[in-house]
Every structure is written in structure tokens, then in C-alpha cells.
């Protein structure tokens, strides 16, 4: 696991080595073990590529950049390739010679043999850049799910790319203007999905794509990574259950290859419990499992992780944390995202990563289980949308919404359940794009139009995704496809990457496996959600290893009481961000409208937890990063 950087600039326009080292320094936390640089002159440009390394595989010989045998090609790489041994053996049989045991060298050798068509053969999480001197081009690629980040920007004098925004921006003469589409997306979704960033002219490379940069003319094109889809044959649910079992076991096995200590995050939920079980079954010695508990019983679920640990006989590490532990790290965590990000579960993810780092360098997680196997309530609720809209006329529906809205508005909602009920009812749509509404956890378009100034609001901010993924969402497969592009890539994986990398620990997600994704896409919806039983086929595959009904117990997740914090220890900071003079100078918000929304929450007139937290996170970024 590492961080990578690179740029193409006009010759003699910058001190390339100093700039590259600055970029590496800004992402030192991603790879504190070593660093490397490559600089060359090509045509009218200077080309630079750098990286910082967190050593996991081939610790002694895996430093980068890595060169081809004839020095004509060079690579810097962030991530892990889980099938690299299989690919390496195939290449050796074709006559390739390897100098290291690293997966980085395998990527480069495979590229030498097959070009960018080889990228689809990689099973793993990655962002890398390959410079090919024979054709004067750089290829910059990102993995299938988007586990590893990659930002890029074309400027008047060249092209820049980096693992984190802070590194890329250090190469620009000034910070770009705020992108209004990204601004609206953030306040709707509470995160900014690829390809957008908060800055004009800077983009995220979307998952499963690569950039082809022509260094002769400073021109680039973006292509989807071609890959063959795995086909599966099954005649019954029992067959599908066996395939599920084997695919999950194999994925855990491939993701447990490491030359450094490894363990699992064990929350006690279905996904992390199954990953931990598989790893325990595959290892000869006790595995290390890690969980956090809360000193407040309302938020604590550590009994579930203890139960699983006892079942699989793991060496369990449990860290009890308080609200003070969470709030003490807010600045460090939120500002590390480099752009507005309002998923409050990042606070707990950071803490479990930080505490786990004292014991292991790699942790397997249950991330992706809900998206791959159909684990969200919103999936079967989505199926009810068509039934509901066919039975309930719009006029009656909106009367129901108004009544429930008034009923729930003044209630406290620390876990967001009442908010979700209100959001669910308001998102029911008679025009078939229900699911895009239900995943919008922030403001509605009407609310955004009210609180944002005219020049800051962008209507139809989700249109890019509706055009790319599809407008109509009527099946679980549709919902999962939307989540893969938006919530998984833009929220979940960003959260895990930034919080774990901030503590210099590598997280691996066995459920984020292309074969598993292909397989579950070929299953009937009823195999994923059977009545009210979510992740049905996954539970069927592993139920024999757990006590009866254990896998059907609900889990609350990393909920934190941000609504209370905004009325207490965060209130002074929040009110500073609401200062009239500051808001007028900022020229983004309507002062009267945003003040009313915030003050209604602070005075407990209306529970606006999610909206006010989103506003708070944006203002924290604006004041401490954008204005800094």
C-alpha cells in the first residue's frame, strides 16, 4: 500500500525533483516505510513520477519505481494485486524473468506483454502509472471498485495526478474555484462521487478506468478497462450456496497473503463475522480480531464481536471509546479528506484503525458485503416503491408525508431512524428514479435551492449518473449498480482508504472481488433478498458455522450522536461558521435560510441533525482548507 504522484510539465518550468518530493511529503502517511522518484525529459516536457511505500509484500526488494529489464518502462503503484502469483507463474512459463517477489513487477511485465488490455486481468485494489518510453505515453489506471484513489488535472502547461488532493494542489499556482455541481452533490449525498471533486478542473478517475496520456502533445483520453465476465452455472439455491461459500473462502485466502502481521476488523455483523471465520479456518494459529465498543450502552454492540471471537477462537482486542475520543479527532479526520465529506462513521473507523495499528499492519474488513450480496434495507424498500405508487394516488401520499413530517420533526434522532423514515416517504417517486432520492441523505433539490445562493446551486446534479448508470431503478440489480458507482465508490471506500491510510494501516475487503460481483449479478433477486431476509445466499452459505439465527440479528453500525455534539461541544464552532459577515463574504449560502435551519436544530425545535452536520463539515473544510 502506498501513495503515488506524477506530473508532466514544460521543460524548465518547475524544479521537478523539489516539486515531486513535496508531493511525496504531503502523502507520507500513506507510505512511511520508503519513497522513490523518477524524472525524465521527453519531447518539450519533463515527466516525474513518485511514490511513498507501506511495505507489505517483498519488504526488502519491493521498493519503487520498478523498471522493465531494458529500462524502457517504469511503474509506480499503490495497492495490492491478489492474483499476482498466478499471473507471475503464467508469465514465467512464457519466458519472463523476475528480479523481485513484488506484485508491482508483475503488473509491469504483464503490461509489456499485453499492453493496457492487461489491466482487466488484475484482481486487486490499485492505482498505478506506467511510463512507456517506446511510445511516449503514460498509462494511469484505477481498480474495478475504486478502492484506491486517483485524482488528475490537465493544466495549460501539463498534466498532474496524485493519490490525494492535497498533493495535486501543491503543484498548482493557486487553488481552483469551487465546482457548483460538486457543491450540490455534496449537500445532496454528503459526499462527492467520481468523477467530480469540489474543485473546478480537478477530477477523480472513475473506478475501472485508465488514462492514456500522450506526452508529446499533452493530451489525454480515458478508457474503461476491458475485462471478461466470469460465468457461473447453478441449477438450484443449494448450488448457488456452495459457489458462494467457495468464492468467499478463496477471496479471503487470496487477501490474506502478507509478509507482515495481519488481522480482521470484527464488528459482530454478518460480513465481518464471515470474513473472520474464513480466516480463522484457514490459519494454523489464532488470528487477531479487533473491534471497538462504546462506553454508552445505546451505541455499544461489542457483545456481538465477543461472541464471534469466542466461536472462532481468535485473539480478540476490544477498544472501548468515549464521545470525547471521537470528538478529539474531528479536525484531523475530516480535514484529511481534502474536500467536504460528512460520513460521521469515519470517526469510529479512524479510531479502530489507529488502535489496530499497534498490533498488525494489515486488516481484513467486511466492506462491500451489503453492495455485493444485497444487504441494505433500501433494496427491498426500493422494490416496494412500484407497488406503493400503483396503489396510493400522489395526492394522498403527499398528505401522509406532511402528517408524518410534523409528527417526527421535534423528536430526538441520534441514530437517524426518524430521519430515514421521513426521507423514505419524501423520496417515493412517481417517475421511477426513486432510488436516486433514497440515497440522497442530505438536502433535497428544493431545500438546496432555498439555502444556496443562485450562483452556487446546480439543478440536476445527479444527471451525469442517471445518464451513465441508468435512470430507472426497479430491481435489486439496478439498486446495487447505482450503489457501486455512488455510495460504495464515493463514500464507503473513500472513508476506509483515508482513515486507514492516515494511520498507516492497510485494509483489504474480500467481498470486493470481481468474481463475486459477477456471480451475484447472475443470481435471481430472491437469492439475495428472500422476503425480508437480506444477504440471503451469503447467510445460507455459512449458516452451519454459527448458532441458529445469529446471522439474522440486526446490527446498528457506527452511529455517533453528532446531533447532540452540535448542540454542545461543537456549538461555538458551528456558530462561528454561521457568522453573518463570514457568510456574506463566502457568498455561497442564503444567510436567513441557513441560519433558521441551524438555529431550529440548536434550539431543539426541529431535529436537523443530518443537514446541520453536512453544513458543519462543509464549513470546516472551507475555513481550514479552502481559505488556508
What does each model-found stretch correspond to?
Residues 1-7, 21-22, 117, 170-171, ...:
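Adenosyl-5′-phosphate
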